[in-house]
């Protein structure tokens, strides 16, 4: 069945891990009649969590699209993971949604995941609605949670449905719009008398009326005259407030026991904006272009998620903003400027894929086997090429080195990782030019563990992880002059080269070469060979075999043989001079230093500063950021940062994040030299290069 954009609601379901997002999505799907049996996260039978790792871990790891069709309205629910290592799912889903349904556990209250979901909605100018789950449990405290929300989310919070525990221990739900109460028997709604909740009832009605009055001048006037709003006025005012961002309505219920979900679904329809009201703003030739959900307009479709399947191929999840998308549509990729050949169009519900002739404006679907399109791309009618903004992903700061488990799989790793990165843009992969290690980056330990499992299960590539090597450097502290004399007689022409070279420390991280030879003791045509020998030798320091930096080599004197001297002979002579001089020039180890910017709540700044000092770092200052966090700026050795991702997450309960970028090299403390040298020996860094 096709839906007009006014009858489509695209909703990101977000919140803390374990708060009940997936169970709520499953319950709404079951309520719509799309499934005969309600799945359970514990059993691995929900529509949302179908990935083998999700089933094994009993937690969402990827965003999934679950369309719920109910009473003429299509709700495209995008179930986002709540675990902090998988925030990419919410970052993708928000790009396809007009609204965010924030789930809050009736047991745990307002946790960090709920705060992050609220902030994500604010940043992206999306309508917000809260659903407090598990309110039928004995230890659930709705009104305590409501106060938490007012503190964390501010004055926009407005309760619309509240629970009341009855004498028999069951829970009834009071709809403040209609001022009627209901209990649920086997998921079926039964109206009852409104339970007595004391002074709270009048206070809740008053607070709701005030919030609604502020959305419209006529309603404000009626409110001040002391007149009660009609149910229609309440709904209209509430909808206006939700769509403008003035009001965050709060509902509650139980997904497991199918309680108050009918009220939630009804109000998702009447309060949240439809796909027809959500205009997108793209860019064409540097100018902003507004796109409306008009099926007759030129095609504009956004790729918000990619799944790499080794059997089916690439599956691109798409929201059509205007026009219609079908396999015969002409489309240009705004990023590449090239035509994009479209595969078959699909509707998707979890892992279930169904062919559909087209995806209409405002709706979400998928396209198979797009050749070049990736997440964040815009597909357009060639007559109107518009680029929409790319998703903003969390920063991947947790780095590990890749080690192939099976011999012969080395060539498969980069290809498999490239496929994985298509579906998870928070995974990064590079080959370190110096250490030659393959480095994979992600959001944390769990993130990389799941990435490894996907590589094995999807692409048959098994890898393990190890701590990345630190790219140390070596330098010298004082000047030293030495001779390098290379003489070899092998019958016929021999080899002869003789040089005196002065080695001295200089500023910077390069190798400088100069010559100060008088009288032709070393012919000019051999100067490049001497420089080449010095530079080759400097690739390996004498302490731990790391590259030498901050050194100047000056050719002072030497001698040559008119027959036996050659370029190779002077290269070897320069290397011998290097090996003779550097041990006497006060060799030192240098370690890389990075600039740390840790974004943390104000309460955590003292702990961060202490941790920086503990890690041999220096705090440089502190400034607020645009999100209300404090940015602690510091410089810290790279070697001390390997587990900082885990530390920061535990300290801030997931609220904080950081960036870390290389700045320069500094002298390694002498007390640490022996350990680094020992590690270098184990790696074979000190192999003779002659």
Language model region names:
Residues 1-690:
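Structural and coupling elements of P-loop NTPases
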């Amino acid at each position: 069945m096709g839906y007009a954009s006014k009858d489509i609601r695209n909703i990101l379901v977000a919140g803390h891990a374990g708060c009940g997002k997936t169970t709520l999505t499953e319950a709404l799907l079951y309520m719509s009649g799309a499934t005969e049996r309600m799945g359970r996260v514990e059993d691995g039978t929900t529509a949302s969590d179908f990935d083998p790792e999700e089933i094994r871990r009993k937690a969402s790891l990827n965003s999934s699209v679950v369309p719920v069709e109910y009473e003429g309205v299509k709700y495209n629910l995008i179930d986002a993971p709540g675990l902090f290592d998988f925030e990419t799912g919410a970052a993708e889903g928000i790009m396809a949604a007009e609204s965010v349904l924030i789930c809050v556990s009736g047991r745990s209250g307002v946790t960090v995941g709920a705060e992050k979901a609220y902030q994500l909605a604010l940043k992206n100018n999306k309508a917000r609605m809260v659903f407090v789950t598990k309110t039928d449990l004995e230890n659930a405290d709705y009104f305590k949670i409501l106060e938490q929300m007012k503190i964390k989310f501010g004055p926009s919070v407005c309760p619309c449905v509240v629970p009341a525990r009855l004498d028999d221990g069951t829970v009834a739900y009071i709809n403040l719009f209609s001022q009627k109460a209901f209990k649920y028997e086997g998921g079926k709604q039964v109206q009852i008398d409104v339970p007595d909740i004391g002074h709270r009832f009048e206070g809740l009605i008053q607070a709701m009326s005030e919030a609604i009055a502020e959305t419209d001048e006529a309603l404000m006037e009626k409110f001040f005259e002391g007149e009660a709003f009609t149910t229609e006025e309440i709904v209209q005012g509430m909808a206006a407030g939700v769509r403008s961002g003035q009001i965050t309505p709060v509902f509650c219920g139980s997904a497991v026991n199918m309680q108050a979900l009918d009220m939630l679904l009804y109000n998702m329809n009447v309060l949240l904006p439809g796909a027809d009201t959500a205009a997108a703003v793209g860019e064409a030739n540097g100018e902003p272009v507004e796109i409306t959900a008009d099926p007759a307009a030129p095609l504009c479709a956004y790729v918000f998620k990619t799944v790499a399947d080794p059997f089916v191929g690439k599956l691109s999840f798409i929201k059509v903003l205007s026009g219609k998308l079908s396999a015969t549509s002409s489309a240009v990729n705004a990023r590449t400027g090239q035509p994009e050949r479209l595969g078959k169009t699909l509707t998707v519900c979890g892992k279930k894929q169904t062919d559909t002739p087209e995806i209409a404006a405002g709706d979400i679907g998928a396209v198979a086997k797009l050749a070049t399109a990736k997440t964040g791309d815009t597909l357009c009618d060639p007559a109107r090429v518009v680029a929409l903004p790319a998703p903003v992903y969390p920063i991947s700061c947790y780095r590990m080195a890749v080690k192939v488990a099976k011999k012969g799989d080395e060539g498969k790793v980069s290809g498999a990782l490239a496929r994985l990165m298509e579906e998870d843009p928070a995974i990064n992969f590079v080959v370190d030019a110096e250490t030659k290690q393959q480095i994979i980056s992600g959001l944390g330990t769990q993130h990389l563990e799941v990435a490894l499992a996907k590589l094995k299960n999807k692409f048959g590539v098994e890898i393990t992880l190890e701590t990345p090597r630190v790219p140390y450097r070596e330098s010298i502290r004082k000047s030293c002059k030495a001779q390098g004399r290379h003489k070899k007689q092998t019958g016929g022409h021999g080899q002869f080269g003789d040089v005196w070279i002065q080695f001295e420390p200089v500023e910077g991280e390069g190798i400088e070469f100069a010559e100060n030879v008088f009288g032709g003791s070393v012919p000019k045509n051999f100067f490049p060979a001497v420089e080449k020998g010095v530079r080759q030798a400097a690739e390996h320091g004498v302490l731990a075999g790391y590259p030498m930096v901050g050194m100047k080599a000056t050719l002072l004197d030497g001698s040559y043989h008119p027959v036996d001297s050659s370029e190779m002979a002077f290269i070897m002579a320069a290397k011998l001079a290097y090996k003779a001089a550097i041990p006497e020039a006060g060799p030192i180890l240098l370690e890389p230093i990075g600039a740390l910017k840790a974004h943390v709540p104000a309460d955590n700044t003292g702990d961060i500063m202490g941790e920086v000092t503990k890690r041999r770092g220096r705090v440089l200052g502190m400034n607020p950021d645009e999100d209300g966090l404090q940015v602690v700026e510091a410089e810290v050795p790279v070697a001390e940062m390997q587990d900082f991702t885990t530390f920061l997450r535990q300290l801030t309960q997931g609220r904080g994040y950081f960036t870390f970028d290389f700045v320069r090299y500094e002298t390694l403390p002498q007390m640490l030299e022996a350990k680094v040298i020992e590690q270098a020996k184990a790696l074979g860094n000190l192999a003779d290069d002659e």
